Amino acid sequence: MAQSFLGQKRLRKYYGKIREVLDMPNLIEVQKSSYDLFLNSGEAEVPTDGEGIAGVFQSVFPIKDFNETSVLEYVKYELEKPKYDVEECQQRDMTYSAPLKVTLRLIVFDVDEDTGAKSVKDIKEQDVFMGDMPLMTPNGTFVVNGTERVIVSQMHRSPGVFFDHDKGKTHSSGKLLFACRIIPYRGSWLDFEFDAKDIVFARIDRRRKLPVTTLLYSLGLDQEAIMDAYYDTITYKLEKNKGWVAPFFPDRVRGTRPTYDLVDAASGEVLFERGKKVTPRAVKKLIDEGKVTELLLPYEHIAGKFVAKDIINEETGAIYVEAGDELTLEYDKDGTLIGGTAKELVDAGITEIPVLDIDNVNVGPYMRNTMAQDKNMNRDTALMDIYRVMRPGEPPTVEAASALFDTLFFDAERYDLSAVGRVKMNMRLALDAEDTQRTLRREDIVACIKALVDLRDGRGDIDDIDHLGNRRVRSVGELMENQYRVGLLRMERAIKERMSSVEIDTVMPQDLINAKPAAAAVREFFGSSQLSQFMDQTNPLSEVTHKRRLSALGPGGLTRERAGFEVRDVHPTHYGRMCPIETPEGPNIGLINSLATFARVNKYGFIETPYRKVENRMVTDEVQYMSATEEMRHTVAQANAQLDEDGRFKNDLVSTRQSGDYTLAPSENVDLIDVSPKQLVSVAASLIPFLENDDANRALMGSNMQRQAVPLLQAEAPLVGTGIEEVVARDSGAAIMAKRAGIIDQVDAQRIVIRATSDLELGDAGVDIYRMRKFQRSNQNTCINQRPLVKVGDTVLKGQVIADGPSTDMGELALGKNVVVAFMPWNGYNYEDSILISERIARDDVFTSIHIEEFEVAARDTKLGPEEITRDIPNVGEEALRNLDEAGIVYIGADVEPGDILVGKITPKGESPMTPEEKLLRAIFGEKASDVRDTSLRVKPGDFGTVVEVRVFNRHGVEKDERALQIEREEVERLARDRDDEMAILDRNIYARLKSTILGKVAVKGPKGVSANAEITEDLLQMLPRVQWWQLALKDEGDAQVVEALNEQYEIQKRTLDARFEDKVEKVRRGDDLPPGVMKMVKVFVAVKRKLQPGDKMAGRHGNKGVISKVVPMEDMPFLADGTPVDFCLNPLGVPSRMNVGQILETHMGWAARGLGLNVDEALQEYRRSGDLTPVRDALSHAYGENVYDEGIAGMDEETLIEAAGNVTRGVPIATPVFDGAKEGDVNDALVRAGFSESGQSILFDGRTGEQFARPVTVGVKYLLKLHHLVDDKIHARSTGPYSLVTQQPLGGKAQFGGQRFGEMEVWALEAYGAAYTLQEMLTVKSDDVAGRTKVYESIVKGEDNFEAGVPESFNVLVKEVRGLGLNMELLDAEEDE
């Protein structure tokens, strides 16, 4: 693998053997490309039809008024610059969006009243503002109201035509009833189905069924056309006194026993005798000879056949029989032929009768029987029938029925198959319509019914609806497009009405349009759609996975309850497209999936996966992306098929996939091969080393739990990785990458300034400033913090990681820590997956994480007067105000705990009647305390921490307090510093370029002290101030022009810099847009350090999870022979039954990696003593093996080598890619290299007694994660608190500060103990006896211990409910009763 800059600083030993010819595509490409297509569809010179915003406008416009005297046309659209950038939107709780301006043209016509001819009277064009269009951030998310959201892609059934059967469930006989459904992208569904009697029916929009011939009549076919479309015609000719002559099809008699002699019409020879079986050999002989073409059939054989065409008396025009009628022969008792339609035809001199080729074996009479049952005979009655079904209760007229039928399937505004639907239909029915033909055609419907009838006759196969060729992905762009179309259609109605009601000559397009519905549709989609989700921002992996998620739920999709097993199951076509492992446990299993690593979505919305081409057993490097449908035609080998040096298959038989089946195929038949073994799984699953040794259920848990890992204080990359960590860190946007190559100019914790050396354009300052995100709060309250990785003077390349983000370490994803674990029980503290940890872990902050809580308070304008944020709060002592500044807002850096005031706020309260005591107090102490109450923002119970940031927002025109002004000053200083730095680098750059241009040239004139025609030298330039260099006029015309251009560019750049600075400062100083009624808002961010403690949940990467049971002092933990205590004790019983053996291999491999790292450490110490590099080179060569050493390390200079060695002293990192990683032999080999025993087990000693344990223990280094289920967030206690209004019982749950439920079973327990008084308290005074609660409070205050329980409030609720049922239930007092 190619080494990146950081990859050289910390080399990973790569165990993969399969060469990858294709880099993994950008992981958030799905989101970005889809939305780009939606927004920028109008950039093409010729606008593409039907794509993106432009497509939506083209489909809705032009809008005509009702009289068609004016028309509103769409011309073009443009997105302006967004008002605020992403960061400002997040701080101000705004949506990151850009104003959308649409150019519309209003054309007014003059209509000549006599001729009705139109002439253009007036044309007006105008730009109209159509609301704000949300923009996507560079990381593929949207900022909506200040929070980051992700739009999840949706899987839905592809538009097109599908054939299916009911699996024999509908009818008791178990007969298969076939059905066909045409699903459009939008519009009415059309179903065709068989019933148990083999009659074909049609349904529109799942309504009442109609005979399918009714639909065909409505399309303008008559009986003859229908019969012609579905059946072949054969002609029966009458031979005098012999019978009928008909064509002979030898194939059809194979294997049958004829009921009459089969006689050759030409020779009269009996081919097959009656009742004797026809052998295949005899049939083959007949076909080969090809002589017999016609058979002679008995006269009565024509009975039961159906006429193919209307047979008419040429002279009178009378119809003998109609197409589809049955031919009959009637006999009297003694067998004499007396009548029937066939006899009538013969009697009338008709000797050739065209009949339908129905033999009831290969071709059934279904369509003919349907036609016979259908009471309609022509188009008009058929249309009326359809009208009655679609609009029951309305009197049908032919015109209305015809109009309705046309709008159902043939009107592009109401019905849209979409390009996908048309392509799918063409493929399934072998049609050749253009994919711009988006409505149905007559041929399509006829072909669908034909295919359905063929299925019933046993030809063709039904479709598999879970096949990925029949399911497609709707990504952000498309979902947004549909939503915007809905908004525009709402708007269209209003526009039409306005065009008809106003004086059209005087208005402009602006006056006709109210953009509210369109903007509202967009806002509603981003705010409340099921697919617009709060981004999972726990760590970089969870962000990436969230953006790559595919959901089958959501509008137009499935619901959890209705989704069966088949939809959720893994399908062969998922291979390389959707991950078979990563899906949630629980009700959503299989409905929410993840895109595989190499997969991409094509323009039709189908998921494609890459394959390498194979030609004549030779694997080429040509890569081809294929959708599931295309792949069905190929034979695909697996990536691990053995190849020789030339890239040919070694074996004659190769394991392959052919149309969904796994088979061994000859290698010459193979035409494709997988690109990589990891193309099967998703990003999260491909981060699990030794995945191939884990059970699938545990792998599922492993990939899901990695997403819940909390970023730790100090990230540490895994020793045993898979080599994909770097890709995730890069694509997630957590780490910062250099946009272009350059040299580091300045670095501090806040920002990196790079002087660019490549991609320089003329008008470019050549400065890139990267700001770090420092201690920002993520959606999940984890901490986002970025740290620079580079030093001043470093050279960086484009795309290189220059700063680490949360959970990244030197540009690699680092979700947890490498710790020493022992698989052994320890005094029962590992029972049921509990985990025992060493005190070192807690002491050294190994698993400590920072969490940031946001507190917000708003001062509103109330009816009684404005609320006020102040330090002057009634009845609060100075001690409680110690952390507040003069404005009443907490200082940054203050340590706060539950109940502390963060922001002081007072609210005016109304006059309430006063008790005498209060009157006395007011008389003594004056007015102030009475008219306001304390509504300060206080810290919630259970939250401790340090204030890290405060933001103050003021309404326009409200005077700013001291704190707001201070924050503003700091912000402006920061912006000025940025501007000055950029200016300094710009100056340096420009003057360097100027100097190189003018040095050594001759100046015609210059500033004071420069003689005419002097040569410009270094000394001369030193003497002049830099600003005066511009005044040196050069003799050479060309050089003078260059200097002129440079000067102009310099001025432009300075102006741009100043303008940008002014704009930013203006935004900082401007008031904020706050919700109505809010005068001022303060946000306080409190950071908490959470150490690892009992009750926290931890997990490995293999689905091995557990809860910490105890923290043991370091000296009591089991220790190794060299005195190293282990960090974690895990239960060995957690492995066998769960079958996730990958964790054991990881432990061994980690142990070997650590051992090799220690060897390097010793060599480094030797180097520091002696200054000799040889031991370091030897140790690295030993650790990495000769090949890696020769390729990557041998050529390093001393400084780089020592840095590289220093980075691996804690363990040599290795990469073992999924399905292509280290085998058991490699693990043994690594253990031996590191100087350990092959078993991977060590002798351990008990820390408490110092004695050796009875047998060797598996000890190793394992990567463990701390999950986002922290005991601090879950533990909760309450004495008194809020009560429910109706039942007066305490609320439930930590969020409501609720109580613990004493439920039915707990009551039984107290009953069983006979604890009557405890039980009474539980059910009354501790719960919902309002009077009792008060009495208890009083007695506690007075120091007494007697109280009595009253009636629980819930009993009163019950009484009221019974009264609501009309029963007057009363509670009688016992004394009164007597």
UniProtKB/Swiss-Prot annotation:
This is DNA-directed RNA polymerase subunit beta. PANTHER family: DNA-DIRECTED RNA POLYMERASE I SUBUNIT 2 (PTHR20856). Keywords: DNA-directed RNA polymerase, Nucleotidyltransferase, Transcription, Transferase. DNA-dependent RNA polymerase catalyzes the transcription of DNA into RNA using the four ribonucleoside triphosphates as substrates. CDD domains: RNA_pol_B_RPB2. Its EC number is 2.7.7.6. GO terms for biological process: DNA-templated transcription. One of its GO terms (molecular function) is DNA binding. It catalyses: RNA(n) + a ribonucleoside 5'-triphosphate = RNA(n+1) + diphosphate. Gene3D superfamilies: 2.40.50.100, 2.40.50.150, 3.90.1100.10, DNA-directed RNA polymerase, beta subunit, external 1 domain, DNA-directed RNA polymerase, subunit 2, domain 6, RNA polymerase alpha subunit dimerisation domain, RNA polymerase Rpb2, domain 2. The RNAP catalytic core consists of 2 alpha, 1 beta, 1 beta' and 1 omega subunit. When a sigma factor is associated with the core the holoenzyme is formed, which can initiate transcription. GO terms for cellular component: DNA-directed RNA polymerase complex. Belongs to the RNA polymerase beta chain family.
